[in-house]
Design a protein with these regions (language model features):
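Acidic-histidine catalytic/liganding microenvironments
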Residues: 20
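Acidic, low-complexity, intrinsically disordered interaction modules
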Residues: 23-84
Length: 96
């Protein structure tokens, strides 16, 4: 899985969520917190994550514009947690 580029994971997640009712996916996973993934009408993938920052669970946001491949990530999301969460979402939505 490490060889899949992040942009490809995001495209695949976007496509998987597009096929769901209301283009929305919610999940609570005790180890990883809460996930809320949805697509909007402007071809943007939105991901809300619960991240452990300084031993406190906080909500952080990721947006990916499908038209221009622009990725916006809240600054303080630790890279290891970000990649971990994206991989986990990818597995749940795209590899089942």
């Amino acid at each position: 899985m490490n060889s899949i580029p992040i942009s490809q994971m995001l495209f695949d997640i976007y496509n998987a969520v597009s096929e769901l009712e209301d283009s929305t996916w919610n999940y609570h996973y005790p180890e990883y917190g809460d996930f809320y993934v949805y697509n909007d009408l402007d071809n943007i993938l939105n991901i809300e994550l619960t991240i452990d920052i300084d031993y406190d669970w906080e909500c952080r946001y990721i947006t990916f514009n499908m038209l221009n491949n622009q990725l916006d990530i809240d600054e303080d999301i630790p890279n290891d947690q970000l990649l971990d969460r994206l991989r986990w979402i990818y597995i749940q939505l795209c590899l089942k």
